[in-house]
């Protein structure tokens, strides 16, 4: 990821404007199947378009995404978009299935390590293209660094994610480099490969090393509030002012505002898996 500040922010901002001209029929069709109405923004790109493009390489071959982005034929673009949309649903289902498996294993084995590691069992490996997504979901839910490891043709491949401030995943891998074939990444995300013979030592050594590093850190997730905004001050002018700060992303996060002492009058769940909520606070919906 690159920080969305300075020149980078301006490039992305102009890029979004160009995207909204819909000069590429493939992107236009992909937006249709993603049910994007109106102009796209950085949220649509990150959570609706990009997952459908990336899924080609996660579950199959990236050629389908390449063809979608380069075709000038509307019928081909429509078919490729539909195919990628189906694969994206499959990706979501497989990701959730593996997350559920790992959470059940956590309960059964009563793991309480500072760094959690989950390894695929049996004869069916987990798709290498989605183990990073699984690690990210688990790390966010459990508030701990997580490694997800699956069988590969030549041993094992793994992916790690961490949101723990002060903990560096790539530094941890460097400390146990003798137990790995290859590795790479950065503080919050990593990927690695190792042989069958290396796996036991790797798991033992990295858990010990991580326990030492994490012993003095507060693993509880934190919500950092930028400012208090009384609910009566929320209006179109404020929304337009916040929009001028976009596009949001790395190093330029969307402002987190809080209104204290509010009474929830009504609540509705939204989304396929009820993963979103809609609240009514007094006469306001949020």
Q: Model segments located where?
A:
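Hydrophobic helix-and-loop "lid/oligomerization" segment in the mid-to-C-terminal part
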Residues: 1-198, 270
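Active-site phosphate-binding and catalytic loops of NTP-dependent enzymes
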Residues: 28-29, 212-215, 249-255
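Conserved strand-to-helix beginnings and helix N-cap segments that scaffold or border functional pockets
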Residues: 62, 131-132, 203, 236-239
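A common structural junction motif
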Residues: 177-181, 208-215
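Conserved short beta-strand edge segments in small beta-sheet-based binding/regulatory domains
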Residues: 182-188, 214-223
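OB-fold single-stranded nucleic acid-binding module
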Residues: 198-204
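Accessory interdomain/linker segments of ATP-dependent helicases and helicase-like nucleic-acid enzymes
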Residues: 223-286
């Amino acid at each position: 990821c690159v920080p969305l500040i300075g020149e980078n922010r301006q490039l992305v901002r102009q890029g979004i404007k160009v995207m909204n001209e819909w000069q590429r029929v493939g992107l236009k069709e992909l937006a249709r199947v993603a049910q994007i109405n109106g102009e796209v923004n950085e949220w649509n790109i990150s959570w609706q378009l990009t997952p459908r493009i990336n899924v080609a390489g996660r579950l199959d071959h990236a050629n389908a995404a390449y063809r979608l982005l380069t075709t000038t034929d509307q019928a081909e673009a429509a078919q490729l978009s539909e195919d990628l949309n189906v694969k994206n649903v499959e990706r979501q289902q497989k990701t959730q299935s593996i997350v559920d498996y790992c959470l059940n294993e956590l309960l059964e084995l009563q793991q309480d390590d500072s760094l959690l590691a989950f390894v695929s069992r049996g004869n069916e490996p987990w798709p290498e293209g989605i183990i990073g997504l699984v690690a990210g979901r688990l790390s966010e839910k459990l508030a701990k660094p997580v490694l997800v490891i699956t069988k590969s043709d030549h041993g094992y491949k793994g992916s790690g994610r961490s949101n723990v401030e002060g903990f560096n995943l790539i530094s941890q891998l460097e400390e146990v480099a003798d137990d790995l074939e290859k590795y790479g990444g950065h503080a919050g995300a990593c990927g690695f490969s190792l042989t069958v013979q290396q796996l036991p030592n790797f798991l033992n050594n990295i858990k010990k090393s991580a326990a030492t590093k994490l012993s003095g850190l507060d693993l509880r997730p934190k919500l950092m509030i930028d400012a208090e905004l009384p609910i009566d001050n929320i209006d179109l002018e404020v929304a337009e002012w916040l929009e001028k700060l976009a596009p949001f992303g790395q190093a330029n996060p969307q402002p987190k505002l809080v209104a204290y002492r509010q009474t929830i009058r009504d609540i509705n769940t939204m989304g396929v898996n009820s993963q979103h909520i809609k609240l009514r606070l007094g006469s306001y919906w949020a």
